[in-house]
Amino acid sequence: MKRINLKRIAAAVIAVSSVFAGVYGSTVPSAAEPDEYHDDWLHVNENAEIVDMYGNPVWLTGCNWFGYNVGSQVFDGVWSRNMHEMLTEIADHGFNLLRVPMSTQLLLQWKNNEPDPATPKINEWTNPELTVEGVVGGKVKYSFDVWNQAVKWCRELGIKIMIDIHSAETASAGHQVSLWYTDKYSTEDWYEALEWLTDYYKDDDTLIAIDLKNEPHGKADVPSQMAKWDDSKDPNNWKYAAECAAEKVLAINPNLLIMVEGIEVYPKEGYDWTAPAKDWTTNTEFYYGAWWGGNFRGAKENPIDLGEHQSQLVYSPHDYGPLVYEQSWFHEGFTQESIMEEYWYDNWFYLLEEKTAPLLMGEWGGFIDEQHDPDGSNTKWLTCLRDLMIENRIHHTFWCFNENSGDTGGLVYDNFGTWDEDKYALVKPALWQDENGKFISLDHKFAIGANGISLSDYYSGEQPTLPSESIDTLIKGDVNNDK
């Protein structure tokens, strides 16, 4: 596969576009020549905007669909409905990015071509395409083959994919484990899984991002299980682990966006990571708390450093409402302004305001029906956050498509067969659309679903090109020099 190495022509690129100007200087990641699989890689410019290869700003507005992380070996819901039909509905509703939770365990299973521990939860009668014979009622395919079929369909539907390492071990409660390693799967196993995944899809820009680890968390009650953020090389230092993982991933594919989530707690002024969780005799709190994965206070003094690949960094907090947990900022009469002052700003919004890096809200969602939310407080929070993301073009993936998320519900119900139109109506204004209400894809070739347009359509197909006198000097070849 031919590539253009922009490191050799940084000056020419800067003359054409300001995409990688300023802080990135000559450390521009290699960009591929425009073609079906290499024209959609995304990068970050000096204004903390995510941009395409031409410097055009994009807005990642997607949703989550889980199943692979919990042991289903496939998206949940394929046990009843046709996978392609559901992916088509997601595209038609305008979600241009699919965040897919997986596990280190599953990726290593696929890497080693190990058999599925159980038959994937696929209805072979409604999914003949996912059977070995390709017929109704046939034998269900190997889970990795099914996954690659999903990738192909996403590509054709204009949906981009972000893989989320939701847990080390495949389990319905795997996200409850605070760190990226367990007794069964080490940090090295996590690295191995990430490297294999990156290498396998390095020539397919359907997969544009990796969320290195879902919701690192933990408190000082159990220090060894507490994800922390400092300048140490301690095994539970999330900052160090994330930088090491990102370095390995970007050495293989320097075009992937790297999503780094936050942690749960951070020491208050005058204290450090050796402080206890709380002094119960005086009721003194020694740490600032946050949602799991939502605390980026440590990034102010110790920001993530990806070296020459800094233009691939995106910080990815999670945020939920009072129906998940009655946090202190959900007091009576809360507003968008009060949440900003009491929680959002110091934990993650400052990163966007200071243009440190873009933000992608990796999870946000919840019930809005009268039965679950009788006083409307959860709906109020959702509206506050949605409006903030629209106003500031914060990227996001809504939690979730699934109906079987116990504390949030999903975009569908009735065994994945019916869309929750009220919830979708709340989310829809935060999906990337043009002035005519057409959904916008992150793909230059494929429109998003039946109701959208491609990225090239949105920008009228008028893309800047490199100066002709510089093209002759380009050195083309595989970006990793491994072919």
Predicted regions span which residues?
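Sec-dependent N-terminal signal peptides
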Residues: 7-19
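Acidic, divalent-cation-chelating loop motifs in proteins
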Residues: 474-482
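Structural recognition of the beta-strand scaffold that forms the well-ordered cores
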Residues: 50, 58-65, 96-102, 106, ...
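N-terminal carbohydrate-binding accessory modules
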Residues: 28-99, 110-130, 137, 463-471
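C-terminal segment of classical bacterial N-terminal signal peptides
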Residues: 19-29
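Extracellular glycoside hydrolase catalytic/binding regions
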Residues: 79, 181, 191-208, 213-392
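Aromatic-rich peripheral "rim/lid" segments of glycoside hydrolase catalytic domains that contact
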Residues: 371-471
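Aromatic-lined substrate-binding rim segments of carbohydrate-active enzymes
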Residues: 75-172, 200, 237-254, 374-397
